Structure formats: C-alpha cells, structure tokens
Amino acid sequence: MNDLLLENLFGEKALCAQVTRDQLLEIIAAGARSKFPKSLLSMYRVTPRVMTRYPLKLITNESITGVVITTVYNLKKNLNIPQNNKLTTQDIERYYLDKSVEVINLMVGNTSLGDLACGRPRRTKSSKKKDPVIFLGISAPLILVMNSKKSINTYIQDKKSDPSSDYVNINPGIGVLENYGNTYLLDIHNPSSVLTISTIYGLDNNMELKKLSTASEIDAYQDVNIGKSVDLKKFNEIFNTMKKHLSLSNFSI
C-alpha cells in the first residue's frame, strides 16, 4: 500500500511557482472554480481558463490532435475506483469527456514541459541537482490521443488589444491556444461535444509507446509498470517522439 501512495505524482509542490499577483488574480477569476479533469499537468498547477477579458483571434479552422497524459493510479484515484479493480476505456471517457467537463487542456506540438517548468537555467551550486521525476518506476503511464470529430475553430487571446473591464465566458465547442508558464496548451471548451479518444497508449520498459487497442490489452497493462523512473529530461525526449509519431497539432502563432 505504501508503494501505491508513492505513485500519486500530483503532490503539494508545484514545479513552477513563478506567478505574479495579477496572474494569480486572473487564474482565480478566469477558471479556478471550473470543473476540469486532472492529468499530468496537475503537478504544474495548471488551471484551465473558462473566461477571458481579451478578444479572441481566429488562427485556424481544422481538425486537431492532442494528448492527455496521466497514470492508471491517478485515474483510479480521481474516479474513486478501488486499486484492485480494472480501469476501462469507458471509465476514461467518462472522466475526460463527460458533458459536465467545462474545459480540458491538451498537450500539442507547441507544448514543452521544460518551458512549463519555467525553463530556468541552473546555478552552478545546484548543477548536480536531479531533474524532477515525472513518472515513478511503479507507474503505469497512459497517453490518451484525442482528436476532434470535425474541424473546429481555434483561437488565441489577442493581448495586443485593450482588455475589457469584465470577464466573459469562452464559447463552447472551440479551442483556445493558451499560454501557461512559458509554453502553450490547447484548451478545448466543452470537450464532450467535439473530442473523441481515438487511441490509448502505454509505455513499455524501453520507454517506447505501446498501443493498447483492446480491453484485454488495457487490463494486462495495469498489472505491469515501467520499471524505472522518468525524469523531466527523459520525459521531454519521450514527448518529442510523441509529437512526431502521433502528428500532434502545431499552430503558427
């Protein structure tokens, strides 16, 4: 049981805490109370935004592909599924694509976890400090590939314009490429209406993507683990491979 507790990756400390007072107030006003599912991004204290003070500028109308990354343990925990029970595809869809979910963050081609962690250069005294651990060796990571059911409008906040005095809700069924930390995530609003989980992957012991196509493959994957921890540097390598292999959407800004 103690080993299982170690897999709760989304602990009390954020990997990047450089938030100004104004940014904190904006986060609270724009989405801190919204209903959204947890993922790997929770360890970075990412709170999706459901409101904005800026006009939205259209950047594209096309089908999109992004990923959500989590672990078997954390999905079971968030769904209140006993650890000795099996997680199903239906459970995953229920958690991420329920009609009550207001917004979901997708990692796309514009995303870099190194930048999300502030990308601060290390000082000489801390040069031997290890990178933060993204996955523990006892983890069973899940990479959920999400595709839009059709072409959707994707916007970016036009921060060259003067902000309005009031926050306004962002319309459902659209994507907004949002800046978090020093990188970008694609926020999909009311994802149940526009997204589908097209493919589920795990990671094998060689840190390569392992496609989980059937219910039996998903069941069997939950009985194993990756065997060794994955730090931020290694995860960035894995994620860069994902970008190419999974053809994640990449937006010109």
Curated annotation (Swiss-Prot):
Main location per the UniProt record: virion
Location within or outside the cell: Virion
InterPro entries in UniProt: VP8_pox_nuc-bd
Pfam family, one: Pox_VP8_L4R
Origin superkingdom: Viruses
PTM characteristics: Undergoes morphogenesis-associated proteolysis which cleaves the 28 kDa to a 25-kDa product. Proteolytic cleavage of major core proteins P4a (A10L), P4b (A3L), and VP8 (L4R), which occurs at a late stage of core formation, is required for production of infectious mature virions (MV).
Gene Ontology CC annotations of this record: viral capsid
Keywords for this protein: Late protein, Virion
Sites annotated Cleavage: G31, A32
Propiece span(s): 1-31
Record-level Gene Ontology MF annotations: structural molecule activity
Induction: Expressed in the late phase of the viral replicative cycle.
Known role: Major core structural protein.
Family of this protein: Belongs to the chordopoxvirinae VP8 family.
Full protein name: Core protein VP8
Organism: Fowlpox virus (strain NVSL) (FPV)
